[in-house]
Each structure stands twice: as C-alpha cells, then as structure tokens.
Amino acid sequence: MPKLKTKSGVKKRFKLTASGKVKHGVAGKRHRLISHNAKYIRQNRGTEVISDADAKVIKKWAPYGLN
C-alpha cells in the first residue's frame, strides 16, 4: 500500500504540541492594521490552540504527524 501524503497547507499552517494539541497562528495580521487599535493587535499576536473537533480533521490530513 502506498504512503499517505500530508496536505501541504497543513504542514505550513499548523504545529503539534507535545501533549497532542494542534496550534495555529491567529488570522488577520497581514495588512490594514492601522484600522485596529493596539489592544487588538497585541491580543492577536502569537498562536492559539484549535478546538478538539477541528484538531481531529487536521490530524487526519497529517497522517504521520506535524514536525
């Protein structure tokens, strides 16, 4: 049986934590930030953990894990 391929978009956008949770970067930080206040920009910095339901789908698209 051939190897399963990982979705390239998943490789680029998600990381797996040691406990098995899936992290992703917060959306809406590329351009047009002048219209947002400093609190919005600060709070959307970094990454967040996605929900369990979404994580299940992401893990299916990455059959050998995300490194």
From Swiss-Prot:
<dbReference type="InterPro" id="IPR037229">
    <property type="entry name" value="Ribosomal_bL35_sf"/>
</dbReference>
<dbReference type="GO" id="GO:0006412">
    <property type="term" value="P:translation"/>
</dbReference>
<comment type="similarity">
    <text>Belongs to the bacterial ribosomal protein bL35 family.</text>
</comment>
<dbReference type="Pfam" id="PF01632">
    <property type="entry name" value="Ribosomal_L35p"/>
</dbReference>
<dbReference type="InterPro" id="IPR001706">
    <property type="entry name" value="Ribosomal_bL35"/>
</dbReference>
<dbReference type="GO" id="GO:0022625">
    <property type="term" value="C:cytosolic large ribosomal subunit"/>
</dbReference>
<keyword id="KW-0689">Ribosomal protein</keyword>
<keyword id="KW-0687">Ribonucleoprotein</keyword>
<dbReference type="InterPro" id="IPR021137">
    <property type="entry name" value="Ribosomal_bL35-like"/>
</dbReference>
<dbReference type="InterPro" id="IPR018265">
    <property type="entry name" value="Ribosomal_bL35_CS"/>
</dbReference>
<dbReference type="GO" id="GO:0003735">
    <property type="term" value="F:structural constituent of ribosome"/>
</dbReference>
<protein>
    <recommendedName>
        <fullName>Large ribosomal subunit protein bL35</fullName>
    </recommendedName>
</protein>
